[in-house]
Amino acid sequence: MLDLQPSDRRHGAPSSSGGVSGGDELIRTYKGWKGNNVFFLGGRLVFGPDARSILITVFLITAPVIVFCIFVGRKFIDDFPHHRGVSVLAVAVGLILLDLVFLLLTSARDPGIIPRNLYPPEPESNEGNGEPRLAHTPQSRLPRTKDMIVNGITVKIKYCDTCMLYRPPRASHCSICNNCVEKFDHHCPWLGQCIGLRNYRFYFMFVLCSTLLCIYVHVFCWIYVKRIMDSENINIWKSFLKTPASIALIIYTFICVWFVGGLTCFHLYLMSTNQSTYENFRYRYDRHENPFNKGIVGNFMEVFCTNVAVSQNSFREKVSKEPAIPPRTVNGGMSSPSLQKVSNDIEMGRKPVWHETVEEELGDIEKDMEAGVASRDLSRMLPPEESEGRGIMHSRESSRGRGIMHSRESSRGRRGGSWELSSRVNEDLRTRDESVSRVGEDSSESSDNDASRDLHVEIYDAVTSRGRTGTGIGRL
């Protein structure tokens, strides 16, 4: 069974030494948060990135109730003895206050965010499979999924590249909030927040209260229309003209109740089967047994009768402003810089750009080749007899090294196949021909001189043909 204990290398977690180093600047965790959340009151309230949509939701709830209380509910005060008609207004106000409280509890709390790791987990060792490993081999690729046993049923858990962790069962990564959320249900655009383990019950109560509020306003608007019909002995159409506010509320609540009422029934079904909206839409348990199903009673008790899970994040805790990522070791050796750079890119929420690493490696190779080309001048320091014997060989090696180098330099920073090498190659060949001619004059072997000239022509033809075909290092 796979162990999923929380890692001590999570973002914002204190170090094992008891805190951060004394020289680092300390900030609150929420100020350096890498997700897209919006924080208020010093990190005490946690909203999603689209928190402004809450204002629209509040308006759609409160505006109809205000209209109801002014134009409809107030008319019922004198219709009951001992001013019992005030209870009509009191119930409406109570429902809307309860609805707004559940809205705040849903949208302003941590939905169950899983803290992200500072770097990827250690790869599984190959011990026991007979495959030898070198001390400085590159870091192996992490498997995309792993198996975990839940109530005797195998469940696959996935690796999150952004958070650099294996997500627990039923968790998923929200692309809007940029967080992994435990028991992820969905991201609600009306509340601007993810719905997960820590706020699902409050979300359901919010939807239920909204449904009851719509039904309540809808019913009492019809009662008020009926009261006008009976008191003035007119038909329903004329009564509508007497109270246009009631007609508007009847139409509005009728439309809304189809949405919030249908949502309430849908989540009642999900709770009875212990599913999430995300799991239901993916048809995850259509052909497989649900390992989390505890029966109807057990499922409802799990939602409403259990303690709210403690948040894994301390948003007000002081941490280092930019925590340094310690270098990884692979079997006792330090990891390569390219792997460390990829880890940093993932931690910053950015996909690794592989061509940057390639350009760095090409830069190192280019420096080595420059050093190799510069060594041709050492022949001038040799004794005359050795210089004469090695002149032709040295010119050949120099022409090869510089030919490759020029092709790389001319292609650097270009995307197409236009190399434009002719002018630079001609100049280099002219310089080398002069050098070879001097060596040929000192040497009695004229045949070697002719062979060297033929070699330069072949190099020129090969380089220009590579430029026309668009192949070579420049195509990287």
From Swiss-Prot:
Compositional bias (Basic and acidic residues): 1-11, 387-412, 425-441
Gene Ontology, cellular component aspect: plasma membrane
EC number: 2.3.1.225
TM region(s), chain numbering: 53-73, 85-105, 209-223, 246-266
Modified positions (Phosphoserine) in chain numbering: S336, S418
GO terms, molecular function: protein-cysteine S-palmitoyltransferase activity
Functional note: Palmitoyl acyltransferase.
Family according to the record: Belongs to the DHHC palmitoyltransferase family.
Protein name per UniProt: Probable protein S-acyltransferase 5
